[in-house]
Amino acid sequence: MTDKSFPASAITRVPLALLLSGLAGCADAIGFLEFSQLFMSFMSGNTTRFGAAVAQGEWDGATRVASVIAVFCLGAFAGTLVAAWAGRWRLPVLLWLQASLLCLGLGMPEGPVPFPFHVYPVVLALGMQNATLQDADGRSLALTYVTGAVVRFGTGLANLLLHKPADSFWIQAPLWGALSSGAVVGGVLHHYFGEAAFLFTAALAAGLALAVTVLTLAKPGSRLIAGTAPAPDAPADAAPVTVVRERATAPS
């Protein structure tokens, strides 16, 4: 089977995955504490809150949570398009966008209860984050939530006994550990800095963006920073993103 990982080399992919998962956990904890238990990246929790709000007739609360879910979905949508169109600049572009959005929320107006405008940039960034990296099957790595990671770890343990687990099995437990550790750090940062703690997550995203920008310039086309993967979660026969980009920009 063709390896559709992005980046192709685990030397950069795994550390990036763990750092970004930690960043997501940190941002989610800050948002949860700052915005009345509203999740920034845990859409399962927000979906439960939406259902409970509808059942109780709390329409402002239901609209608030539904709008966050919609923005997160928009982030995944936009991130996937960026991944497909940015070519070899995929990682730098996505990470710089995420860093900018994590800062932007601090300057946004709060908005009315049903539409928390200052929350949307953070949620958009975390939705976009899930299109940043891919596993060997071309699936987007779930960096901002761990339900899938826990399930894959459990099924991987069973497959370890039955025959051989998938290659992606080994990263699931570290991803859970990174996200939960990030949540602890986010809780501590919020205690001392309040909403301004988002600046720490933005700084981490910017640091990673700078690192991959330098690597892209120094080693263009290297497995450390590139790959032949199609867009995240694309069909098995989809062309690699660089080929997609060339076709789309070729004269008709």
Model-derived features: where do they sit?
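C-terminal ends and interior cores of transmembrane alpha-helices
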Residues: 99-114, 213-216
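Short, Lys/Arg-rich, polar N-terminal cytosolic tail immediately upstream
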Residues: 1-13, 223
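Helix-to-loop junctions at the C-terminal end of transmembrane segments
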Residues: 75-88, 190-191
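Symmetry-related core transmembrane helices of the 12-TM Major Facilitator Superfamily/SLC fold
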Residues: 96-101, 196-212
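A membrane-interface helix-boundary motif in multi-pass transporters
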Residues: 89-94, 187-203
